[in-house]
């Protein structure tokens, strides 16, 4: 029987295992020197001024919004075509998520939709760099500066992505994810980067109980042993066990993303004869990280629904993903915003399918997926 091919699998080697073993033997397994090394290495990688390691991108989004003072009575603009955690964090802070539509072909937010949604209550704009490609930062930064509204880039999909000639995260504020399916992973984790030192200081405090320093700073760096709480905070710090894995993965990032690009190019070539619609790449200069390889399944063109095709691929031993069901179509938000209609988002939400893509895949795995797709689509047309 052919082995099951998942849509994603973390790429781990002996280097990651050795890094974890080193931390376990060190006697310091929670937030400590490895986290500091990871933050420094990430700054060097993307060219940012400040990097704050966190236990998840969701936690990073939470404390970033809090650090900006966002709360009841405020509005935050973001696409509905995103993972629900961003909208959850806005909602849990008592602010109002203002969900906007996206480009039908790239899934990127459109600057004109964001500008139309701006009101005197707007306190932040959160674009998403989708599937490994960047949003149009020039236009978004222009809006941010014109209206004096902070821009928070959701860069969960964009480790190793470039916009024009700069790495995502090099300017402004961005939040990355190191979740298990991301381009680099430490099982769970994330990184907030910013060039605003005052904002970074608030985020560092909020992510660790509202203290000015963490335990490693107090015990090993000669800081005051009794740190004071300067504001109520949370516990979103990253452990050194996780940071050690992320450091190894960060070193491997160029090779990881190069392999993803090769696999994506193979998909694009072989899918040309099928009625599936891959996401379009933006037409401005960029370096794609190929976090996800996504196609749209139009039932009229394909003769089968997206869900039907996913089920059929499962019978061939091939896993798929759905990234994502639009937030405003989820039960809680559907009931809260019953009149919200975002046509491009809704069409994509109903037709998106993620195909297997991870760096340990073989070329033959791509071929296997395409052969299965061809067989299924031909059978429903007969």
From Swiss-Prot:
The gene is arnB. Its EC number is 2.6.1.87. The keyword Lipid biosynthesis applies. Its cofactor is pyridoxal 5'-phosphate. Keywords: Aminotransferase, Antibiotic resistance, Lipid A biosynthesis, Lipid biosynthesis, Lipid metabolism, Lipopolysaccharide biosynthesis, Pyridoxal phosphate, Transferase. This is UDP-4-amino-4-deoxy-L-arabinose--oxoglutarate aminotransferase. It catalyses: UDP-4-amino-4-deoxy-beta-L-arabinose + 2-oxoglutarate = UDP-beta-L-threo-pentopyranos-4-ulose + L-glutamate. It comes from Pectobacterium carotovorum subsp. carotovorum (strain PC1). Transmembrane segments: none annotated.
